[in-house]
Amino acid sequence: MTEYSLPTMNLWNNSTSDDNVSMMEAFMSSDLSFWATNNSTSAAVVGVNSNLPHASSNTPSVFAPSSSTSASTLSAAATVDASKSMPFFNQETLQQRLQALIDGARETWTYAIFWQSSVVDFSSPSVLGWGDGYYKGEEDKAKRKLSVSSPAYIAEQEHRKKVLRELNSLISGAPPGTDDAVDEEVTDTEWFFLISMTQSFVNGSGLPGQALYSSSPIWVAGTEKLAASHCERVRQAQGFGLQTIVCIPSANGVVELGSTELIVQSSDLMNKVRVLFNFSNDLGSGSWAVQPESDPSALWLTDPSSSGMEVRESLNTVQTNSVPSSNSNKQIAYGNENNHPSGNGQSCYNQQQQKNPPQQQTQGFFTRELNFSEFGFDGSSNRNGNSSVSCKPESGEILNFGDSTKKSASSANVNLFTGQSQFGAGEENNNKNKKRSATSRGSNEEGMLSFVSGTVLPSSGMKSGGGGGEDSEHSDLEASVVKEADSSRVVEPEKRPRKRGRKPANGREEPLNHVEAERQRREKLNQRFYALRAVVPNVSKMDKASLLGDAISYINELKSKLQNTESDKEDLKSQIEDLKKESRRPGPPPPPNQDLKMSSHTGGKIVDVDIDVKIIGWDAMIRIQCNKKNHPAARLMAALMELDLDVHHASVSVVNDLMIQQATVKMGSRHYTEEQLRVALTSKIAETH
C-alpha cells in the first residue's frame, strides 16, 4: 500500500516566520469551548516532531515514529543527527493496524489514535505523543445534516474553516486563499480528532498517560462518566458528542478509541489491540487484509515522500520497505470519494517528487501542503517502476485546500495530489458541479479521515530505476481491487461489468476478482473446520485430514449408539405391551368379604379365627390364631396350595387350646392384596366339617 507520512522535522522551528507563529498562537489560544486548558494541549504547536532528544522544554510537540530505512537511500537531512535512534516498527503497517482495528470490530468506533511512548530526557518520565491516527467518521453523518443558522454555530464553523485555511497556508507557504472545498461543515468529532494532533501526555497524566502508567486498559462509557472525569481531554470529548473513550496500553504506547455511541467493555477488543500492536513480534512486516465491509481506499492524512524516497533514474539501487525523510510534502485526504463514470472506475492523482540537488537536501523541510482532496487513494502497489497512485473515485463530501499546481516529475512519471481528476474538461466541470451534492454512501465510508505520522515508502515490491519492467509480488491486500461504491446520487453511477453466473445471496458481498473469491472461500472453509473441531470430542491431531478422520469415526460411533438405543426402545415397548395385556386379563373373583372373626356352629361349637396378612412385593407374611381342633394346620396348607402360594417358611405352636401358625409365602401366577388374601384364607380355614 502506498502511504505517505508526516515529516519527522519540527514544523515550528526557528525558521518559521513571525506571522506564521502569531497565526498559530491565535489558533491555539482560541476562546472557544472546544480547546483544552491542560498543559499538554495548550502549547502552540500543530507540527509533528519525532526528534525527541532535541525537543524543547517549553514547546511540547506531537511525537511520531519514523520508518525503517536503507543506508543507500538515506537523505542528507536524515543523516545530520547521528544520535537519532532507529525505529522499532514499520510505520506503513501502523495505519493498517488502526484501520483493521476499527473496520474489523463489531462495535462502531469513530476514530483510533496510537499515542507513541518516547523518552525526551533520561531523567524525565516518558511522553506520549501523536504516533498515528485513523478517522472513520459517524454512521449517521449524512442523516444529521442540520440546517443550523444560529450565529454562534456559524461563527464556530467559520473559525474552524479559517484555521484550516491558514494552517494550510502556513505549511504550504502559499498565501491563504478562498478554497470553496473548505466551506464543508467540520463536525465536532472531526475537529476533536484534528486538534488531538497537538496534544501530548506525560506518563501518568491524562487518560492515555494513566493507562500507560498503570499498564491496564481504561474504559470510560456514558455521558455522565465522561463529564465527571478529572481528565480535561475526556470532558472535552464529551462536549464534542463522544460517549465512549477507551485507552488500551501496548508495549510501545497507548491505543485510544472513541465513539459517539455507548459501547460496553469488550475483552475481544483488548485482545485484538494487544495482538495488532505487539511490534516486538515483527508483526508490522506483513500486510493486513482488507475487511469485506470496509472500503480499503479509506482516506488518509498522508505525506508524499520526498527527496530521500524518490526513485531516481540515475540510481539503479533497490529501495527497501521504507525510508525516513525529513523533507516531504504533507497532504490530508479527507471526505468521501466521487464515482467516476469512466470504464475502469479509477482515477489517478498526480504526485510530484521534488528533485533537489544533494547540496539542497539538508534544508529544514520542504514546503508542506494540506490537501483535503475529493478523492481517496486505494494504496495499490506500483508496477513497472513508476510511482503513480491508483485511486478509486467515489461519491461524497469534498474538502480540498492547498496548492494544486505542482509540476509532474519526468523520471518517476508521477504527479502530486492536485485535487483534480484526470478525466477531461467535460468530466472536470461535471465534478465541480457535483461537489456540493454529496449523498450518504455508507456508514463505513462517510467522512473518513486518517492520519499517518512517519515516513513510509510504498510497498516493498516496488522497483527503482529507469528500466524497472518487472511486476512485483504483492500481498492479498495489495492485489485485491477496491469494491465499487454503491451511490444513490442523481447522476447514474458507473455500471461495472460483472461475470455471468448466479447472483450472490442476499446480504453477501460479491467478490471482485478471483483472488478475493479464493480468500473468501478459504476463510469460509477454515471457519467450518473450526466448528467441526469444536464438536468432535477426541481429536488425535490438529491437521485437517486427521480431523476429518476423527469426525468420521465419531459419527459412526454415534450411529451404532443410535441403533442400540433403538433396539432397547423396541424391547421396552414389547415388555410394556405384555404387561398391559396381562393386567387386562380377568382374574378369579375374590371371595365375599367376611369378618376377621367368623363363627359357625358345628355340633353346637363355635370356631374363632384371627388372620393377619402383610404383603411385601410378591412375598406375603401370614399369621393365624385359631382353635386347635379340626386340624387348622392341615387346612392352612391346603388353602395355600389352592391359592398357588409357595411356602418358604412355616411354624406351628400350641398354647392350651390355641394354635398359632406363621408362614412366609411367595405368590405365583397372581398378585393378591392383603384384603383379598386374608378373606380367602379365612374362608378356607374357618370351614366346618
Swiss-Prot record:
Keyword Plastid on entry: no
GO cellular component terms listed in the entry, alphabetical order: nucleus
Recorded GO MF terms: DNA-binding transcription factor activity; protein dimerization activity; sequence-specific DNA binding; transcription cis-regulatory region binding
UniProt signal peptide: none
Compositionally skewed regions (Polar residues) per UniProt: 316-349
Compositionally biased spans, kind Low complexity: 350-361
Domain bHLH: residue ranges: 509-558
Tissue: Expressed at low levels in roots, stems, leaves, flowers and fruits.
Annotated spans, Helix-loop-helix motif: 523-558
Renumbered residue ranges of the record's region Basic motif: 509-522
Disordered: annotated span: 316-361, 420-519, 563-602
Location in or out of the cell: Nucleus
Keywords: Activator, Developmental protein, DNA-binding, Growth regulation, Jasmonic acid signaling pathway, Nucleus, Plant defense, Stress response, Transcription, Transcription regulation
Induction note: Induced by methyl jasmonate. Induced by wounding. Induced by infection with the fungal pathogen Botrytis cinerea. Induced in fruit by storage in cold. Induced by hydrogen peroxide and infection with root-knot nematodes.
Entry-linked Pfam families: bHLH-MYC_N, bHLH-TF_ACT-like_plant, HLH
InterPro entries with a match to the protein in the record: AIB/MYC-like, bHLH-TF_ACT-like_plant, bHLH_dom, HLH_DNA-bd_sf, MYC/MYB_N
Bias type Basic and acidic residues, positions: 471-495, 506-519, 566-585
Reported function: Transcriptional activator that binds to the G-box motif (5'-AACGTG-3') found in the promoter of the jasmonate-induced gene LAPA1. Acts as a negative regulator of blue light-mediated photomorphogenesis and positively regulates root growth. Promotes growth in response to the phytohormones abscisic acid (ABA) and jasmonate (JA). Binds to the G-box motif (5'-CACGTG-3') of the RBCS-3A gene promoter. Acts downstream of the jasmonate (JA) receptor to orchestrate JA-mediated activation of plant responses.
Note, other: Plants over-expressing MYC2 exhibit increased number of branches with reduced internode distance. Plants silencing MYC2 exhibit increased susceptibility to infection by the fungal pathogen Botrytis cinerea. Plants silencing MYC2 show decreased susceptibility to infection by root-knot nematodes.
Subunit (UniProt): Interacts (via N-terminus) with MED25. Interacts (via N-terminus) with JAZ7. MED25 and JAZ7 compete with each other to bind to MYC2. Interacts (via N-terminus) with MTB1. MTB1 and MED25 compete with each other to bind to MYC2.
UniProt protein name: Transcription factor MYC2
Gene that encodes it: MYC2
